[in-house]
């Protein structure tokens, strides 16, 4: 049976003053082994050469479409605009400073089709501003358990139009964690497939979460998301509860809250997790090494 390569994949690329790495990002889409795609570049009022670069690519490839907002929408609304224009059977988005590996779209699409799944995510390599490897975000089946309290998805993912229509738009009130909120909403409705292979390069550089105010906003909003989506997970076991309270505890810890309301439950479930999982795994490794 041959590979199914005719489903249209819509890739939304939000841009804001991304001239430095934009060509690398677009080139990584063009280099995909899966060629049935459309790239929608959503320019959120850039003041650098992003417009010029995007229009250059649009003129060269009729699969690339450039749109410029009349006013700055910020990321969640910009994504929503992009997906409202998308025509694909499968949807994803990337960033103006990140890069796909050549087989990323093909392998994620194949994973969804073969597993009859609605949402898939894959491992990423983290690179610095010069493109040098820093570390990895590794994905496996076990990591899905973490999604109730922390983000295992990374930046390499694909989901179906069916899932998009069921889950709806990205929440414009959740800037900085709009993606994690969306992954939780997708996961609670459809579950997820995973790919351990590294299919994406995610760039850490000076534009990341640097200011204290931005970090505080991130952790405050993340706590809000964890509390908001908890009920959708239904009944969870003790391991899931550990990850949930670990996420909440870390939010308050990073906000320097001396009266962290999640401390007791986090410590309780941390102890349980250590005894139930960490100790047996360590013993198993020691026995294997003998």
Where are the regions that the model predicts?
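N-proximal low-complexity "stem/linker" segments adjacent to membrane-targeting elements
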Residues: 1-30
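C-terminal subregions of glycosyltransferases and related glycan-biosynthesis enzymes
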Residues: 2-4, 181, 188, 203-290
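Cell-envelope/extracellular polymer assembly enzymes that use nucleotide-activated donors
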Residues: 7-10, 38, 181
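A conserved acidic beta->alpha catalytic loop
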Residues: 35, 43-52, 71, 95
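Glycine-rich, basic loop-to-helix element that forms the pyrophosphate-binding segment
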Residues: 69-86
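Conserved nucleotide-sugar donor-binding catalytic segment
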Residues: 84, 122, 136, 141-225
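Short aromatic/hydrophobic "clamp" motif used to bind/position activated sugar donors
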Residues: 91
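Conserved donor NDP-sugar-binding/catalytic core segment of glycosyltransferases
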Residues: 103-134
């Amino acid at each position: 049976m041959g590979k199914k390569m005719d489903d249209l994949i819509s890739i939304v690329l939000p841009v804001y003053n991304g001239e430095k790495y934009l060509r690398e990002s677009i080139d990584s889409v063009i280099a995909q082994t899966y060629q049935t795609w459309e790239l929608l570049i959503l320019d959120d009022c850039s003041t650098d050469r992003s417009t010029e670069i995007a229009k250059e690519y649009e003129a060269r490839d009729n699969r690339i479409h450039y749109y410029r907002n009349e006013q700055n929408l910020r990321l969640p609304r910009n994504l929503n605009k992009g997906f409202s224009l998308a025509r694909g059977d499968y949807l994803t988005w990337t960033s103006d400073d990140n890069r796909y590996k050549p087989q990323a779209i093909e392998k994620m699409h194949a994973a969804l089709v073969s597993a009859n799944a609605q949402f898939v995510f894959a491992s990423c390599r983290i690179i610095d501003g010069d493109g040098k490897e820093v570390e990895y975000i590794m994905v496996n089946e076990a990591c899905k358990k973490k999604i109730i309290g922390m983000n295992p998805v990374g930046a390499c993912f694909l989901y179906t139009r069916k899932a998009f229509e069921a889950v709806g738009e990205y929440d414009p009130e959740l800037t900085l964690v709009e993606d994690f909120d969306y992954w939780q909403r997708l996961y609670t409705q459809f579950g997820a497939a995973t790919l351990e292979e590294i299919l994406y390069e995610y760039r850490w550089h000076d534009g990341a979460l640097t200011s204290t105010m931005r970090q505080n906003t991130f952790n405050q909003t993340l706590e809000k998301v964890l509390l908001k989506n908890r009920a959708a997970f239904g009944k969870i076991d003790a391991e899931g509860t550990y990850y949930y309270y670990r996420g909440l505890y870390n939010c308050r810890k990073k906000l320097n809250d001396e009266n962290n309301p999640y401390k007791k439950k986090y410590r309780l479930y941390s102890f349980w997790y250590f005894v139930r999982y960490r100790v047996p795994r360590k013993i198993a490794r020691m026995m294997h090494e003998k």
